[in-house]
Amino acid sequence: MDYKETIELPSTTFPMRASLPENEPKRYEKWREEKVYAKMQKNREGAKECFNLHDGPPYANGHLHIGHALNKILKDTIVKYHYFQGKKVSYVPGWDCHGLPIEQQVEKKLGKEKKDSLPKEKIRELCRAHAAEFIAIQKSEFLELGVVGDFENPYKTMDFPFEAAIYRALCQIAQKGLLAERSKPVYWSWACKTALAEAEVEYQDKVSDSVYVAFPLQKEALERLGVKRAVLVIWTTTPWTLPANVAVALRPKELYVLMSDGKVVAKNLVEKLTALGVVGGSILQEFDSSTLENLLAQNPLNGRDSRIVLGEHVEVSDGTGCVHTAPGHGEDDYRVGLRYNLPVLMPVDDEGRFDETIQRESLLPEADSFVGMHIFEAQKRILGLLGDALLKHTQITHSYPHCWRSHEPVIFRATKQWFVLMDESIQGVGKSLREIALEEIQKTCFYPDHGIKRLGSMIENRPDWCISRQRDWGVPIAFFRDRQSGEMIFDAEVLEHIAGIFEQEGCDAWWSRDNAYLLPASWKNRADSLEKIHHILDVWFDSGSTWKAVLLSSAYEAGNYPASMYLEGSDQHRGWFQSSLLVSCAINHHAPYQSILTHGFTVDEKGEKMSKSKGNVIAPKDVLKEFGSEILRLWVASSDYQSDLKISQNILKQVAENYRKIRNTIRFLLANTNDLERLSPLEDLSEIDRWFMQEARVALEETNALFGRYDFSKGLQEINYFITNALSGIYLDLCKDSLYCDGKNSKTRRASQSAMAYTLRALLATLAPVLTYTVDEALEHAGEVLKGGAQSVFDLVYEPLPLVEAPKVDFVKLEELRAKFFEVVDGLKKEKRLKNTLEVNLLLPPKEEDFGGLAKWMMVSEVLKEAKGEELASFELAGLTYRLLRATLHRCPRCWQFVSPKEETLCERCAGAIG
């Protein structure tokens, strides 16, 4: 008789091959039709806990790159983790729509001349259309990644109500006395003709001129030193700023020396400067820096006075200890200039060219020939004009700030700009914005925790925030100024009237509407006496106001303010995290977030930055086409995202192999629980079942705890270890005999199936945040006992496995016993003395007892107390000897165990199973 038909073989319709690239789009379309995000909200109505992740808006320009995919998948995984823990979650995606990159794309399409000839309203219309086009493109690309959120109602910073909210945030800051217009040096992109914020500056290596220049001391300073001739030696890498020099700064309370060659430098630097050949001879005298304070040197380029001042910013570890000071070209220079009331000379225009100031103020010989010349072009001529005052000229490579868009070196340039003040006391609070922000950072939870120091040090050391830009596409700094008095109009009625217009018409109205229209009735009589400010806001102010425009708006269901989490790349400590913190602290005096999580950047498998020229770019669309988004999602979750993440074809293949193992495990569990209609009572579980349930509970609880700390890679390691060892390595092997050969409804078979069902149910809910598609697919092929009423993945809630009575047997010892046993069996197989373990009976040492399941645990036919049959091998464990004997009974033709009394006769168990 063929007994195959009598065996309960595993069966499932869940396919072994995932065919992810073909099947994922169909599944996501189904989710979209079913409005799963709305379903998620409904499923958690009345939930005790809430979690909202406020989306840092990607820029609405260009297609997605792998960094976007990393960011959105990580956000989606975290939101889903909290959802599957039973919390109400909110995730409203958004887009950053204003700013220079879009304006540059429009200029690229039109050509610069045509763009410059168009009215601002038309340029803004084209920018708006460009942003809308790429929002649609990026939205589609995000959805392909399996990301779930309120994509039907995303936020866009260019929406009219949003622009009004940004403007209202600006007005609130102004009314608190934290906004000021000042002439101050700022990062200036001459290539883009606009001021830049710190977050818009990137540091790159640059080759610069390194020059040491002699500034002769004037009469009173020489008399103070008792000499007839002496020079201060300054060092600079920006010789083009020398025409605007008005001072030389020394370090307070520092010793300076006059050398026998007439040069004055800091004493600490004499040895270094002598080695460089900048100074020579011996020290004639030493004196404190205060000796020369407020006396004069002479600028060798133009003969103008250069006052000697003291500044804490002066370092004596490099340079000369004498710092060339031009308040129009540097933050430190500007600060020391305020203290000494120094003039601010600014001879450079917005394109980085010398203007008529160079001629009017006689800042250079033959000044008229320099007007209109680019500063970097003029530099060589300036060095030539120094003559003997140029003591040494070399070139150095150093890290230098560059514009994030043009990638050209930036300059410091004093212009009239608008600033959010960091150190002004906030009205009614008694603390500065800096103080409040630093306090709020201490209350914020950081992942990784060193983020607290990084953001804190940036806030501690940052200057006032320059929020004005000289461009077209952005929210205007829409204030009126009195033409006669220069008074700024911060009247609440005026500001709110303008905000109301922006809400209805958008902020294009600032350009298209006249003063009378923009003013409330009580102010219309002053329309002709007022002028508009035409700067626009830094885009970081836009994104820094999203908490106000989204979290505090009834237009979005975005959850609470402050948000549970902000999550972005680690570069956003100087970007969005900081701008959001400052805007929120300025207005509401607390942070807009409870926690911040940062991730690293994507690099190739060698750790190198991706670039088209290297040919190492991995595009999300290519990964989806070849592997599917589940593999990309598993790559994100398996990686240590706190560092830079390596990605390549080889790495993705390894991830795909890991996915295959997880999928096959799910498939095996589905196949072996296919006919289970109800869960067995826990008391029916065997010792081995209870051991397995304990192992599963511990592993999945630990995984969920790690996921709760956002340590997904360690959580997945925990799952993989459990699958490889306790589940696939031991339990599934042990259970095959019961599952296939016990009676269909036998207590032992149903108990094992129930242990698997409990485990699979918890495993699916654990994996759901990462492998959402796969879990949803698995549920379609699962029986009702597994589904527990869930129609889709979004109906799941993670519940720990039930607590079972602890096994009475020491399974730690049994695992050691099993490992030692299989070590011996492997040797016997290599010697070809054994084909499989069922040919073996295990003889226990005296006084050792079988707990009733040891034969199953060891996968042998019988466990014996007395020897019978040929001894094949033996081994010792904990001083006890275990013997492997060849089975003496006959092989059952159905279960293949050597337990039948006669050849070709069913064993007692199998005979009962088939009736």
Swiss-Prot record:
One of the GO biological process terms: isoleucyl-tRNA aminoacylation
Motif ('HIGH' region): 58-68
Annotated motif 'KMSKS' region, positions: 609-613
The entry's keywords: Aminoacyl-tRNA synthetase, ATP-binding, Cytoplasm, Ligase, Metal-binding, Nucleotide-binding, Protein biosynthesis, Zinc
UniProt key word Ligase: yes
Record's catalysed reaction(s): tRNA(Ile) + L-isoleucine + ATP = L-isoleucyl-tRNA(Ile) + AMP + diphosphate
One Pfam family it belongs to: Anticodon_1
MF term (GO), any: ATP binding
Residues that coordinate or bind Zn(2+): 892, 895, 907, 910
PROSITE patterns (alphabetical): AA_TRNA_LIGASE_I (PS00178)
Compartments where found: Cytoplasm
CDD domains: Anticodon_Ia_Ile_BEm, IleRS_core
EC number from the UniProt entry: 6.1.1.5
Cofactor(s) needed for function: Zn(2+)
N-terminal signal peptide: none
Binding note for cofactor: Binds 1 zinc ion per subunit.
Domains as described in the record: IleRS has two distinct active sites: one for aminoacylation and one for editing. The misactivated valine is translocated from the active site to the editing site, which sterically excludes the correctly activated isoleucine. The single editing site contains two valyl binding pockets, one specific for each substrate (Val-AMP or Val-tRNA(Ile)).
Family: Belongs to the class-I aminoacyl-tRNA synthetase family. IleS type 1 subfamily.
Subunit relationships: Monomer.
Name of this protein: Isoleucine--tRNA ligase
Source organism of the structure: Wolinella succinogenes (strain ATCC 29543 / DSM 1740 / CCUG 13145 / JCM 31913 / LMG 7466 / NCTC 11488 / FDC 602W) (Vibrio succinogenes)
